[in-house]
Amino acid sequence: MDELPKCGANYVPLTPLTFLTRAFKSYANRTSIIYAGARFTWEQTYKRCCRLASSLQSLNIVKNDVVSVLAPNVPATYEMHFAVPMAGAVLNTINTRLDPMNIAIILKHSEAKLLFVDYEYLEKARKALELLMSTNFITAQNSKKISMPQVILIDDLYSPTRIQQQDQLEYEQLVHQGNPEYAPENIVDDEWDPIVLNYTSGTTSEPKGVVYSHRGAFLSTLNTIMGWEMGTEPVYLWSLPMFHINGWTLTWGIAARGGTNVCIRNTTAQEIYSNITLHKVTHMCCAPTVFNILLEAKPHERREITTPVQVMVGGAPPPTTLIGKIEELGFHVVHCYGITEAGGTTLVCEWQSEWNKLSREDQANLKARQGISVLALEDVDVKNSKTMQSVPHNGKTMGEICLRGSSIMKGYFKNDKANSQVFKNGWFLTGDVAVIHQDGYLEIKDRCKDIIISGGENISSIEVENAILKHPSVIEAAVVAMPHPRWGETPCAFVIKTKNPEIKEADIIVHCKKELPGFMVPKHVQFLEELPKTGTGKVKKLQLREMAKSFGIFDNANQTSQILDLPARL
């Protein structure tokens, strides 16, 4: 049997680009994209992507060149997920919330040859490019020479602004100028070839470039649509940024299911509610912060949801109270876990039929867990990262989430040191702390660096935050370590409250004493107008830890804490 050879008929490189070809052949007349008053079919989308790919090649884009895009969830961003790799290039979607300096750093590090910019972000892009070519920036980046990417405007498809300057290329112009006969055949020679370059939004350092292979992107897409049990012809609302892990790979996944992409520029309550009712949306993804947007919507912004909308939520673990409230509006929540380095969805809280008999509160508690491994991932475990031994399935012992599978990134671009830190003994170390329950479901407790060590006890900042969020006058909460002379560290809470002016620090502490063991109760509560966050909405806990130092109690005779089973690399 070993002598039977591979050939073109039985071995083909895996790539998510085949999902578009299949959608064109199988669902040609189905609606592929809706954006304001514009609509496309899968036949039109396929042909537009082919034309754009041919135009990119005419601009001397060759294999493995990086093409960056700074744009919201508009049709152009979606189409480039296919057209750019069709041309043999690597797509880099840039977080639109980043400041010009971070955009300049990404453009420099990625060596982008082209930069597609939506008209709303032209000024930000201009500032980034000015920084890119400035002497101070070049010196700070230890660069001898930085090449300027060619800028291509993305005007609004439905309501063009016509701000295109003379001699400046525009997206639709490239689409229409492309070769209508262009048919990408055998565009992927090796499934290990790169398809996208995504930059992490780290809260402690400059972003790192994460490289995915065609094979990894293909399997990650299957992970998401199978783990979510997404059927055919979904109507998917783009409330999740496409720049965030390629929309958790659903940029390719909606094509795989022959669905409809409902594109929106802004994630507002009115946009979400109106598009759900107008287009009969069946699926959407978001971070828990979007739940707050929907719950706080004004009466004129709301619409009645008559058919349940399946919502996959990731990011920070949502409080069980928040899940309960959002489901009362007509949303059905599925909790997942994923990180940029793993190519999207890694764990999903797969529903068990016996849970149907439980109370709504118990169901919400179960849904708040991150769940079990998706199908196409080889293995997931929670390990003591010093010994690499698995933790017991008792729901109490914390360890680091470790992953293994073909959907894991190729590695960090131009960063051997970081690669050596995260790949260990055949596993990828995520930096996330979790427990495993008796039923095998994982529950994230914290980031490794955010664990609070108080008198030798490991305290999950997320558990403390969830307890605080149960208070009716609290909108958001973040908990970090604060120095303490006896215990080493104790929890310090930063809270955003409602307009109730009566709530005091003592009220939060009394509330926490009812919800938590004494050693987990915050010793200080600081009220803020808003929490410091990164461009992707992650709380900047490093900044909060610096603030908490000023609230700490110091005693030079005793400032040590016993660290138990924390990852050695942190």
Curated annotation (Swiss-Prot):
SUPFAM superfamilies: Acetyl-CoA synthetase-like
Subunit note: Monomer.
Subcellular location: Peroxisome
Keywords: ATP-binding, Ligase, Nucleotide-binding, Peroxisome, Phenylpropanoid metabolism
Species the sequence originates in: Petunia hybrida (Petunia)
Domain of life: Eukaryota
Protein name, UniProt field: Trans-cinnamate:CoA ligase, peroxisomal
Family annotation (PROSITE patterns): AMP_BINDING
Chief location bin: other
Field pH dependence: Optimum pH is 8 with cinnamic acid as a substrate.
